[in-house]
């Protein structure tokens, strides 16, 4: 946590011969800054610039070192991206500023432009556990359970047909319908 993986210099005979960013190798597999070391070379490891934590529904949640000017989109790229159950439209960020913390809800269209600073904490939530197109049928039907609500399953008659009809023990004089939404 003290030394940088992003700003490493190789000095030879008093002259800087290379700047090495280990993330280029670790995250992208690029060896663009690969240099052969010689006897007497000095390797200078700078202190880190910005450490940013990311937790929640990303593939590699942990603390990352970010260079000055790197965006939230870059951080998400370093994590390997979102998991399948991540809510991608907005992420929450906590930033320490002076004496207090500030919270930001960053929309997906702003990921490229939102610049991270030292000690930012990013949280990616999961999608909600509710359904937007679900109807359930229970009781004296052959296939009780959840069904997709769409133009095909738009009537109770069609729902009963999808549940493979009523069983012989069904009480045909009454049914109970419970609606959870006003629409």
Across the structure, where does each feature detected by a protein language model lie?
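Ser/Thr/Pro/Gly-biased, low-complexity, turn-/loop-rich segments
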Residues: 1-183
């Amino acid at each position: 946590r003290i030394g940088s993986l992003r700003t490493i210099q190789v000095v030879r005979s008093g002259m800087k011969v290379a700047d090495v960013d280990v993330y280029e190798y670790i995250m992208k597999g690029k060896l663009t800054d690969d240099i052969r070391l010689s006897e007497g070379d000095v390797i200078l490891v700078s202190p880190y610039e910005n450490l940013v934590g990311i937790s929640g529904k990303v593939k590699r949640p942990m603390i990352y070192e970010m260079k000055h000017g790197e965006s939230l989109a870059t951080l998400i790229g370093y994590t390997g991206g979102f998991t399948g159950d991540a809510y991608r439209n907005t992420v929450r960020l906590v930033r320490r500023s002076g004496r207090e913390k500030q919270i930001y809800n960053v929309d997906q269209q702003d990921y490229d432009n939102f610049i991270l600073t030292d000690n930012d904490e990013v949280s990616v939530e999961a999608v909600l556990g509710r359904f937007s197109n679900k109807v359930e049928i229970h009781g004296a039907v052959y296939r009780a359970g959840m069904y997709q609500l769409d133009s095909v399953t738009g009537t109770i008659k069609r729902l009963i047909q999808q549940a493979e009809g009523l069983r012989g023990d069904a009480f045909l004089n009454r049914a109970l319908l419970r609606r959870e939404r006003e629409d």
